[in-house]
A protein has these predicted regions:
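Iron-sulfur (Fe-S) cluster-binding modules
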Residues: 1-21, 89-94, 210
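Hydrophobic alpha-helical positions that pack around
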Residues: 104-230, 241-242
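Gly-rich Lys/Arg/Thr-decorated short loops/hinges at beta-loop-alpha junctions or inter-strand turns
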Residues: 1, 53-65, 168-173, 215-220
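Short amphipathic, charge-patterned alpha-helical segments
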Residues: 79-81, 231-242
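Conserved alpha/beta core surface patches that mediate binding of polyanionic ligands
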Residues: 22-46, 66-72, 194-199, 204
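Short coil-to-beta-strand
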Residues: 45-54
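Histidine-anchored nucleotide/phosphate-binding helix
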Residues: 72-86
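Conserved phosphate/anionic-ligand binding catalytic regions in large, soluble enzymes, centered on
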Residues: 20-41, 83, 140-152, 156
Length: 242
């Protein structure tokens, strides 16, 4: 699987290069190239770095991230480990809405299973790499979906965004370099590393690669989750699918 291949066969910059070539962009709304974000965090010199999964899904009617955490929490655990290896971090934090009890429970089970199998903790798969994950709970404030507000909330401060720079990759959680990706972004990492950057880049448009998950709700015929290639028009999503 992806984590074992990275730890045993690839250097951190090799992994980052694959993510860059895949063209994966942040799925939280900003659309920033994920590989570049990881590269920025990798370049920072610090004794401690953090990997943060933004699971604070606050958009009305949105349940994409919740469905991923309920259905495949292991993909998030694996992706966070891969990110930790890539940027030289040993600590992961998942910031999740307290209103998602099933997602929290399944994520907690996945983390404990990973520890039992030696996929989290000290010397993962017999290597020098150590990484562990803990869960932090959000109180439901919509603004905490923004990464600087999220970091403030995790620090016990008021969840207010701050101007960048500095970016979290330079000075984030507790003033240390911090890489923040949302759930859907991270869920793409294992499949990219398994099937290859070229495979992922073959889906979507020239500037936006891969697929996007949408939650359809409201006055339509078909409510629920859909996954479509990037570049699919809103007309197709609403009138042909919804």
């Amino acid at each position: 699987f992806a984590l074992a291949d990275c730890l045993l066969n690839k250097q951190p910059l090799d992994v980052i290069d694959i993510i860059k070539r895949s063209g994966l962009r942040g799925r939280g709304g900003g659309g920033f190239p994920t590989g570049l974000k990881w590269e920025f965090a990798h370049k920072q010199k610090s004794d401690i770095k953090y990997v943060v999964c933004n699971a604070d899904e606050g958009d009305p009617g949105a349940f994409m991230d919740r469905s991923i955490m309920e259905g495949d929490p292991h993909s998030i655990v694996e992706a966070m480990c891969v990110c930790g290896y890539s940027i030289s971090s040993s600590k992961g934090l998942v910031y999740i809405r307290a209103e998602y009890p099933l997602a929290i429970n399944r994520l907690r089970i996945a983390i404990n299973q990973a520890r039992q199998y030696g996929l989290l903790g000290d010397h993962i798969l017999g290597t020098e790499f150590s990484f562990d994950i803990e869960i932090r709970y959000g109180a439901g404030a919509f603004v905490c979906g923004e990464e600087t507000a999220l970091i403030h909330s995790m620090e016990g401060k008021r969840g207010e965004p701050t101007l960048k720079p500095p970016f979290p990759a330079e000075s984030g959680y507790l003033g240390k370099p911090t890489n923040v990706n949302n759930v859907e972004t991270l869920a793409n990492i294992p499949i990219i590393l398994t099937k290859g950057a070229e495979w992922f880049a073959s889906i979507g448009t020239e500037r936006s690669k891969g697929t996007k998950v949408f939650a359809l709700a409201g006055k339509i015929n078909n409510v629920g989750l859909i996954e479509v290639p990037m570049g699919t028009t809103l007309r197709e999503v609403i009138y042909e699918i919804g």
